């Protein structure tokens, strides 16, 4: 419905990370992760592995390779090295921009709040540039300085949110049927899409998206109900003929009227690994 509900509290000390459900939540809703969390208000310690010291359901909200690259860029510009960060720092950075229904507050002061309309071609080309630079050891001091335009696009990519995987991608919002212009924030009636860009440094180069599209066609034939998808024409300078776009299954476009505020809803998402 888009209504925000307090699920509980995450806390960290020298012993590790702990979670406690809010009593009001348990009286109304089910367990977020029934295999690893108990449906009680007792404090529950997270295992050290395999989810960076947090419970699996929250580990699902952490960024993967591409999201980590973007976060690390931002933190380095603030003088913070990746080895100084904890999973809790990264969850605070994700805030309400991750996949699924969970959000985290307070939000990190370093988290991007850019609300911008941006050309999809520009976003994809700059994402490709950032990804390719990471392949040539971007951590070298000589590679950390970005020009103003690339800096703006980096902020837009980060503002778009966090998602799994190592490939360059962006979470964007756009009206149904309009792919040429997109934005990093939702407007009423927008659809949420995940756009997967390409790079010469990927295993299948600029054909990664085309290959995945074939797999999606196969899953449709097999009646596996894949998410809605489309191929979007890529600019010639990208080296790709098309980029793959996947409609986010966790984002409910239908809106509920919450007093004076209308809000899109989210579906809870939990991976098999996180379980």
Give the ranges of each region predicted by the language model:
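Phosphate/dinucleotide-binding and metal-coordinating scaffold of catalytic cores
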Residues: 1-275
